[in-house]
């Protein structure tokens, strides 16, 4: 069991610590708790010099109603920013975001989606290549020619402002399709 101050603790079945490099290698059933967040994995390296936790054999970060899963990631305990790469899935309530790369800011609960990404929220499906999704407000700013499909309607634009259960707005080369009317 490793404890740093009153905000960080790390438990695992096996750990090696390199005092010279100030690096902890934690293996098997690793649980890193930092404030209200919990990071679960089987392989984690914690760099005490840079306050950086890296997982590389799959991991899950739980932050309130948000649950992030990916093959590889890092969590910076000082800035409380995280990066998730490869097979990323963010569940926020009933909403699901899938992408290849996601940056998550813990204090604001904002996800930055990089590369081909999909947001599924009830009957709505959003496809984008670049965007920011606020999991507290369920609002998104999307770039890179994004598309929102909701039942019989779709909107595509160079950028979109998406509000769950509200109005969405497109900007630049907008195409709106209403299959019902």
Segments from the language model and where they lie:
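Structural signature for solvent-exposed beta-strand/loop edge elements and short helix-capping sites
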Residues: 1-181
């Amino acid at each position: 069991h490793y404890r740093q101050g009153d905000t960080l603790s790390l438990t695992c079945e096996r750990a090696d610590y390199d005092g010279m490099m100030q690096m902890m290698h934690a293996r098997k059933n690793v649980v890193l708790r930092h404030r209200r967040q919990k990071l679960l994995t089987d392989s984690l390296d914690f760099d005490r010099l840079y306050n950086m936790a890296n997982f590389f054999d799959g991991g899950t970060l739980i932050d309130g109603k948000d649950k992030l899963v990916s093959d590889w990631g890092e969590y910076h305990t000082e800035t409380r920013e995280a990066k998730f790469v490869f097979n990323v899935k963010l569940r926020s309530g009933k909403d699901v975001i899938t992408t290849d790369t996601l940056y998550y800011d813990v204090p604001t609960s904002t996800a930055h989606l990089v590369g081909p990404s999909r947001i599924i929220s009830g009957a709505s499906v959003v496809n984008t290549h670049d965007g920011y999704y606020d999991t507290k407000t369920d609002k998104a700013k999307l770039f890179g020619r994004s598309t929102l499909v909701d039942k019989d309607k779709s909107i595509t634009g160079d950028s979109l402002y998406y509000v769950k259960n509200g109005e969405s707005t497109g900007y630049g080369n907008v195409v709106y399709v209403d299959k019902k009317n």
